[in-house]
Amino acid sequence: MKSRLKSYRRKKLGLATVIVFCSLCFLFGFYGSTLLSQNVPRVKPRLRMLDMVENGEEEASSMPHGVTGEESIGSIPFQVLSWRPRAIYFPNFATAEQCQAIIERAKVNLKPSALALRKGETAENTKGTRTSSGTFISASEESTGALDFVERKIARATMIPRSHGESFNILRYELGQKYDSHYDVFNPTEYGPQSSQRIASFLLYLSDVEEGGETMFPFENGSNMGIGYDYKQCIGLKVKPRKGDGLLFYSVFPNGTIDQTSLHGSCPVTKGEKWVATKWIRDQDQEE
């Protein structure tokens, strides 16, 4: 009887010891992790923004409002407008002063906009397709640094090296001028072999437009593709130009095939005028 009682007490004592030991481990782990975590900076939840990090340095918190700098982290707010095509809108991408500086630089060199002709097309039978005027300017040719700033920011927003971009095409659309629906990508079956391909386009709106002048995507989300679409119609998803805002859209899928829903155009300006800086981005380095 006594031996059974001793055995029972040993089992009871052993169970109590295990419970106490586990409790101490829990408390040590809980408070230990709390103390250790006090020296670790808190990570704020990410908003729907693109982080810009330069020089490989990353800060845990953003800079105060109104402060900027080349060695700082910043954020580029954006809004997804469409997944078919992939179109992203960037409000306040450039300042009004930067936009005006770009316009002033481009004004003196404007010429009627030209078209890349497909097989069978001529300047005569495509007359009226694109009625704007424009000029090509590289970032290094603009003395105020506005285009250089925009080009670097586009590279950070797209995560594509700036050397993959063509020179800026600065365009002016006056009353009634427009650009019928078209693709920025060059289909080899229509244009012949290409040494590199346009994969994305970035539009920086340099002015407000009182009426008209929207960038439109008639095939957005697959709409209007089977109705015998007239390429002069201004229908589908429309983006109203606002000074300083940017629009990015992709012409190809990640596998390199053409996104048919990236068809787009510029609606006729019905009041005022429209200024825009276009940056075409290619799949290969353009400086080689």
Swiss-Prot record:
List membrane-spanning regions. Answer: 13-33
Residue intervals of the Fe2OG dioxygenase domain: 164-283
Q: Which residues are glycosylated?
A: 221, 255
State the PROSITE patterns in the record: FE2OG_OXY
Which top class of enzyme applies to this chain?
oxidoreductase
Q: By its UniProt entry, which InterPro entries does this protein fall under?
A: Oxoglu/Fe-dep_dioxygenase_dom (IPR005123), P4HA-like (IPR045054), Pro_4_hyd_alph (IPR006620), Pro_4_hyd_alph_FE2OG_OXY (IPR044862)
Q: What cofactor is needed? A: Fe(2+); L-ascorbate
Q: Where does Fe cation bind?
A: 182, 184, 264
What is the E.C. number? Answer: 1.14.11.2
What residues bind 2-oxoglutarate, as annotated? 274
Q: Which GO terms describe its molecular function?
A: iron ion binding; L-ascorbic acid binding; procollagen-proline 4-dioxygenase activity
Specify the protein's topology with respect to the membrane.
Single-pass type II membrane protein
A Pfam family found in this protein is 2OG-FeII_Oxy_3
Extract one GO cellular component term from the record. Answer: Golgi medial cisterna
Q: Where in the cell is it found?
A: Endoplasmic reticulum membrane; Golgi apparatus
Q: Which reaction does it catalyse?
A: L-prolyl-[collagen] + 2-oxoglutarate + O2 = trans-4-hydroxy-L-prolyl-[collagen] + succinate + CO2
Give the Lumenal compartment stretches of this protein.
Answer: 34-288
Q: Which domain of life is it from?
A: Eukaryota
**What SMART domains does this protein's entry cite?**
P4Hc
Function text: Catalyzes the post-translational formation of 4-hydroxyproline in -Xaa-Pro-Gly- sequences in proline-rich peptide sequences of plant glycoproteins and other proteins. Hydroxyprolines are important constituent of many plant cell wall glycoproteins such as extensins, hydroxyproline-rich glycoproteins, lectins and arabinogalactan proteins.
Family to which the UniProt record says this protein belongs: Belongs to the P4HA family.
**Name of the protein in question:** Probable prolyl 4-hydroxylase 9
Name of the gene = P4H9
